[in-house]
Design a protein with these regions (language model features):
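Short alpha-helical
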Residues: 11, 64, 109-113
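Conserved active-site alpha-helix within GNAT-family acetyltransferase domains
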Residues: 85, 101-102, 108-132
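Short amphipathic alpha-helix that is part of the acyltransferase structural core
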Residues: 1-31, 46, 126
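A conserved beta-strand-loop-helix scaffold within acyl/acetyltransferase catalytic domains
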Residues: 32-50, 55-72
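Conserved acetyl-CoA pyrophosphate-binding loop and the N-cap/start of the following alpha-helix
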Residues: 78, 82-90
């Protein structure tokens, strides 16, 4: 069965929380994703195998011209099949239809090739400050 990519789909909080836990580890937490995305995101994309959510990406925004790519997640059994790249591509295509001019992303060094080569992001100088 093929992977179906859905833009701004109706989010099932349990399903997305499970995917997030699988992709990032840590303790499982049920997150109110649907309401959070409605309040803070310009767009989001899910990758589905039938009814199973196997990938997700989100673009939070500042209310203006900038969006921030967050939560790129692919379930462990679905990795290395270009699902992450396609998620970002669908998200970028959707954002191009909006007033967003800049899409930012922060990533760990081991993801540099994914974001720069596969997804087309350019490197810039940036900073981060841990608050807690």
């Amino acid at each position: 069965m093929a992977i179906d990519f859905r833009v701004r789909f109706d989010v099932d909080d349990v399903q997305l929380s499970q995917l997030h836990h699988d992709a990032f580890g840590g303790n499982y937490e049920l997150v109110p994703w649907g309401s959070r995305l409605q309040r803070h995101s310009k767009s989001w994309v899910g990758a589905f195998h039938g009814t199973v959510l196997c990938g997700f990406v989100n673009a939070a925004w500042d209310g203006g011209k900038h969006a921030f790519l967050l939560d790129t997640a692919v379930a462990t059994e679905w990795r290395h099949q270009a699902i992450g790249t396609r998620l970002v591509s669908y998200l970028v295509s959707d954002l191009r239809t909006t007033d967003i001019e800049w899409l930012h992303v922060d990533y760990e060094e081991h993801l540099a090739e994914f974001y720069s080569v596969a997804c087309g992001f350019e490197s810039t100088s940036a900073g981060v400050l841990r608050l807690k």
